[in-house]
Design a protein with these regions (language model features):
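A short aromatic-anchored loop/beta-hairpin motif
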Residues: 223-224
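Membrane-embedded alpha-helical bundles of multi-pass enzymes
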Residues: 1-205, 209, 214-219
Length: 224
């Protein structure tokens, strides 16, 4: 036990509330900002923060704070709409947050490459029923901002972007880092091209807003 205590540095302990605060801020902004595209983009931060975590404690802090803040308004709305006791809404909220945070915590692992692989499975689990039925803004909606109207390809590009950028920052393997940089550059170029095409289509009056599940448009409504 004494040996374990000696390995814990104050900076590591401070990083836990800091990562939790980062998760809470990203959740708050993703709900409170008026512009839909800003909300979609900010939901991109949760998986990135999780991939950047260096311990399971940080992973718990990020996930728990994000989902608690993002889901807080829903518990209040449920109280106002149904008339149920507010304590019931908070109890359900706490149970849901603990369940989802536990999933994100269990999925976290020290080795970076397995962490990136687990992340894709984790993303699928937390964005499908039953969890998705009560979920905060889906992280996959950020695909609509980064790669508008690219459909399934945009969704795949968005999922790839998270581990790709994390590998750039965290890996010491030169080959993996180089490959990640190349992929990141291609993704950025694709994102810019898709957004330019989207803006051109909007200005020309040819923008057709599709269902988010099929085309993932940049905005849920177009200008009339």
């Amino acid at each position: 036990l004494e040996q374990h205590k000696a390995t814990i540095k104050p900076t590591n302990l401070w990083s836990i509330p800091l990562m939790g605060a980062a998760g809470a801020v990203s959740a708050y902004c993703s709900w409170q900002l008026d512009h839909a595209s800003s909300q979609m983009l900010l939901t991109w931060l949760l998986p990135f923060l999780w991939l950047m975590c260096t311990s399971r404690s940080q992973a718990v802090a990020v996930a728990a704070s994000y989902y608690f803040v993002a889901w807080f308004d829903m518990s209040i709305a449920a109280h106002r709409i149904t008339g149920w006791p507010q304590t019931l809404g908070f109890s359900v909220l706490t149970l849901y947050v603990c369940m989802v945070a536990l999933i994100w915590a269990v999925a976290w692992t020290g080795p970076l490459v397995p962490r990136c692989i687990r992340f894709i499975v984790l993303l699928a689990v937390t964005n499908m029923p039953p969890l998705a039925a009560f979920s905060a803004p889906s992280q996959l909606l950020s695909a609509g901002w980064l790669f508008p109207n690219l459909g399934l390809y945009g969704l795949i590009f968005c999922i790839v972007s998270w581990p790709c950028i994390a590998l750039i920052f965290l890996t010491n393997n030169k080959k993996i880092k180089t490959a990640s940089i190349v992929v990141a550059v291609l993704l950025v170029a694709t994102s810019i091209t898709a957004n330019v095409a989207w803006e051109h289509g909007q200005n020309a009056g040819n923008l057709v807003v599709k269902n988010l599940d099929t085309q993932l448009p940049r905005y849920p409504t177009s200008k009339s």
